[in-house]
A protein has these predicted regions:
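Active-site neighborhoods and metal-handling regions in enzymes and metal-associated proteins
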Residues: 1-282
Length: 282
């Protein structure tokens, strides 16, 4: 269960002139089916992640807006960098390392992989994605929420509510024996039902296009991203899989919204590790 990635070892052996052969699936199924001790560690990691998420979202929503729309806390500018530092310090005190939270405001959030930089602003969606690792157990948490300071624009609220509905629809079908693709298809169904698109934009796509551009989720354990994927061709889920379910919608014109929870697969359903509300205003 503690098998780490073998690529660094493979590289070192090859550099030493040793020929290496191994199956890329080595240890994958053993890693996927989490034991009760592993589930406890993951629940604890997610609990800490939720606490720091609550702190971050409340800090955003209770900040002061300057005349230019930028946010400040106690006279200091609130930026992606300063909020990221606060999150890092909070997690260090709790015994967690943090590779760098995503804090993407406004149009930056239209790129689901953008870490974010610069000032945070009022009346704009701010995607906050935190994925720390426990220094004692080495298991990861992973949670995303979206916060909006001040008045919430109608189009942002509609998009976020759709992402949340898609998340819970996906969770409802998540159980052992169902494929990761089937879970993703349920997410897509809800996204389309509410008038949004899915898939990467084309060369002629308008800036107003609002779509989900990534899979529904991924496995979590000793690494924050590990098998299985909840996406096209996603494999059959097994008892003990721990997954993120994280629908999002992204629009170049105004940014993005995303909500992410962590679940453990059971025989007939899944267990959610999350208690945080799904709200834009904290």
């Amino acid at each position: 269960k503690n098998l780490r990635r073998v690529e660094p070892l493979e590289k070192a052996l090859k550099n030493a002139g040793i020929e290496v052969h191994y199956s890329p699936e080595m240890g994958v199924m053993e890693r996927r089916g989490k034991s009760e001790d592993e589930l406890i560690a993951l629940r604890q990691a997610q609990s800490i992640t939720e606490k720091v998420m609550s702190m971050a979202c409340q800090l955003v929503c209770h900040a002061k807006a300057r005349k230019d729309g930028s946010l400040e806390v106690e006279g200091d500018s609130l930026t992606s960098e300063s909020l990221r530092a606060r999150i890092d310090h909070w997690l260090l005190d709790e015994g967690f390392s943090n590779p760098g939270s995503i804090i993407a405001c406004g149009p930056q959030g239209a790129d689901c992989h953008e870490y974010g930089k610069g000032r945070l602003c009022t009346e704009a969606p701010i995607i906050i994605d935190i994925f720390p690792c426990s220094k004692s157990t080495h298991y990861n948490g992973d949670c995303t929420r979206t916060a909006v300071h001040g008045k919430i624009p109608v189009h942002i609220e509609k998009a976020y509510n759709t992402a949340v509905k898609a998340k819970f629809a996906a969770m409802k079908v998540t159980r052992a024996g169902v494929t990761g693709e089937a879970v993703h298809q349920e997410t897509i169904r809800v996204i389309h039902e509410h008038g949004y698109e899915t898939g990467l934009p084309g060369k002629e796509s308008a800036a107003s296009r609002c779509a989900m551009v990534h899979g529904t989720g991924h496995g979590v354990g000793l690494e924050v991203h590990e098998p299985p994927l909840l996406d096209f061709k996603g494999p059959t889920l097994i008892v003990g899989d721990v997954l993120t379910i994280e629908p999002g919608l992204y629009c170049p014109a105004w940014g993005g919204v995303r909500s992410e929870d962590m679940v453990a697969v059971r025989e007939r359903d899944c267990e959610s590790f999350n208690l945080l509300p799904d709200t834009l205003s904290w």
